[in-house]
Amino acid sequence: IIGKGQQKAGTIYGFNVSGSVADPASKITYLRDAVGMTKAYMDFSSRVFNYGSWRDAFFQPRPCMLGYDGHVLYYLDPNDYSKKSDGTSSDISNDSFEGNAMMEFPKIYWKVEPTEDGKGANIYIADYAPDDGFHCWCNIDKDGNEKEHFYMAIYQGCTINGKMRSVSGK
């Protein structure tokens, strides 16, 4: 087991946000493992999000069906939640299914360093904590323990048979 601050092979994406550059399209410079990647953006003319080089980045959330016991039963097609990732039909609108449509978020460590001029910052996002300046803010349970994932409902909550549910169309 690798503890906090110990080195391991992993990914550290970084970017600099320059407070000295007025043009928003030019404010960001990629650092570390992000160097050479292409930007993600919303293509409003086609109404399709363009992930650039970021589609398979470790921090991308994944839609899934989460069982009542807290285990992922299967992943959903990210472009069509009515299908499982294998292309078969999903249970997103099945109110008798013993689970909920949820978005799974992986553990992410963050570090923010103000630039020397005080006008910008270097921001790092990693899948591990390479030093004590990296913190995992989102994946902490009620006892202060880091968890590999956290989940959020995909759909607005509704009550079905006395249970709060995340089900499509309800």
Identify the residue ranges that each predicted region occupies.
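Short aromatic-cysteine micro-motif
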Residues: I92-G99, I125-K170
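A residue-level signal for beta-strand positions that form part of recognition/binding surfaces
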Residues: I12, M102, H149
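Extended, Lys/Arg-enriched charged tracts that mediate electrostatic binding to polyanionic substrates
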Residues: A57-G133
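Intrinsically disordered terminal extensions flanking catalytic oxygenase cores
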Residues: I12-S18, A22-D86
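Acidic glycine-/aspartate-rich tracts in secreted/extracellular proteins
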Residues: S20-V21, I108-K111, Q156-T159
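Enriched but not universal
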Residues: I1-A9, F15
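Short, polar loop/linker segments at the starts of domains and inter-domain junctions
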Residues: P24-T38, T115-A129, N161-K170
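Residue-identity detector for glutamine
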Residues: Q6-Q7, Q60, Q156
